[in-house]
Amino acid sequence: MQNMFPWLTVIILLPLVAALAVPLIPEKQVKWYSFAVCLVDFVLMVAAFFTSYDLSNPDIQLAERYRWMPQIGLEWSVGADGLSMPLILLTGFITALATLAAWPVTLRPRMFHFLMLAMLAGMVGVFAVQDMVLFFLFFELELVPVYLMLAIWGGKGRLYAATKFILYTAVGSLFILVVGLAMYFYGDLRTFNMVELAAKNYDPTFQNLCFLGLLIAYAVKLPIFPLHTWLPDAHGEATAPVHMLLAGILLKMGGYALIRMNVGFFPEATQLFAPLLIVLGIVNIIYAALTSFGQRNLKRKIAYSSISHMGFVLIGVGSLSEIGMGGAMLQMISHGLIGASLFFLVGATYDRTHTLILSEMGGIAPKMPKIFAMFTACSMASLALPGMSGFVAELMVFVGMATTDAYSFQFKALVVLFAAFGVILTPIYLLSMLREIFYGTLNHAVVHEEDLVDAEPREVFIIASLLVPIFGIGLYPKLTTDLYAPTTDQLTRVTRERIARAAPPPALLSGVYSVEFADRDRVSLR
């Protein structure tokens, strides 16, 4: 049903229109202007979902459809369901805090805040649009601000990192365009509308090819090994606000699109690729955790930690269970908060120590007790300490994988065993990182004691704002799971039903899927 007030259109266009006015704002006031726009946009998001969104309805709500180019089926189509609504709220929340983190930027501040506002519009658009062409356009729109913010405000290797980022993501985006056009021309109905595309009956070979194409595209963004190498380079050169947007929101676009399109459009192909997603998730978790051990650069260490944590999203999606799919969604939300907080603290620490090399740090805890306490709390969240959001998300993925009836006992046991090994690695490298940064003796040859100023109120506010939902989700996850559960449960159920009507899995996967699932004797969910 068409929504009466165009909430999502206003939410998308507000930061874009406001960005056009940035050149008119005095340079000293532009940071206040940018923060105010992001705050107003976030308030509009909360108001829209509080007043016009039914949590029990799993379908698209706040829908708007306006003809754009009817000759070829293009339209402005936006909407939100349980997959997109939490991520839209996460985008508004983290972007508002990222603009606050950008206050110390003195090089071309107008241009920087212009790009931040444009990026907000692009990121919200990715989660809200219901048209493949619009999705592609917004997916591309958010690439340009990130490239410029890396290339202009990054570190010494910024041009290499920015070029690598744009090449990887642009090539990945081409697969989205090709698959979108292929679906448009498939069958008699010419449409780019996602709901109508999902309703088409694609033959198995077409589904498999399209699933693979989109998987490559989103493997870059998530990222998935071996298409992950742009992320450590980008994080290694980015400033704190860009870190927060990269870790907090951009990586989630890959996970969101994987669920929305790969699973939603091609459920029969999901049967073939679900075990691959699980294996790739295990590789992400263990490979990135082991690689993080060897990183002496603090930013790159946290970047590989992010790659490791996103592996749980792949396992949750591949589990073909309601609990696992819900765990994947919660892991994206949780990591968005934790990743943004950790990278902000990395930036705050670098501003004081002027080094990212762990061997050059040490002994700064007595001089910066607030930063030490906040860094410790956020690291505990990252290693999935009980009572914090990371624990609940990873637990749901484990339970979903262990209890799903889709896979054989042997396969489930191996997955849980390897994933548990990755979980054990996480506290080892995070706790050793804390020891190298804050304990020991101060390296006076590199770090100047007079620069070690403790956290200012702005920095405390940013981290406190992120820790509140981290603890809130950890202590009472139902507040968050209720936002998406009806949609993820329905999506998983429909996927299982479509798989049940399709051909049995190939003989190659005979030892992976359970006998009951392969024989189609039951399709019930656990």
From Swiss-Prot:
First-level EC class: translocase
Source superkingdom: Bacteria
GO biological process: aerobic respiration; ATP synthesis coupled electron transport; electron transport coupled proton transport
Gene Ontology MF term list: NADH dehydrogenase (ubiquinone) activity; ubiquinone binding
Catalytic activity annotation: a plastoquinone + NADH + (n+1) H(+)(in) = a plastoquinol + NAD(+) + n H(+)(out); a plastoquinone + NADPH + (n+1) H(+)(in) = a plastoquinol + NADP(+) + n H(+)(out)
Entry keyword Zinc-finger: no
Cited InterPro entries: NADH_Q_OxRdtase_chain4 (IPR022997), NADH_Q_OxRdtase_chainM/4 (IPR010227), NADH_UbQ_OxRdtase (IPR003918), ND/Mrp_TM (IPR001750)
Keyword terms of this UniProt record: Cell inner membrane, Cell membrane, Membrane, NAD, NADP, Plastoquinone, Quinone, Translocase, Transmembrane, Transmembrane helix
Recorded GO CC terms: plasma membrane
Family statement drawn from the similarity comment of this UniProt entry: Belongs to the complex I subunit 4 family.
Name under which the protein is recorded: NAD(P)H-quinone oxidoreductase chain 4
Protein's gene: ndhD
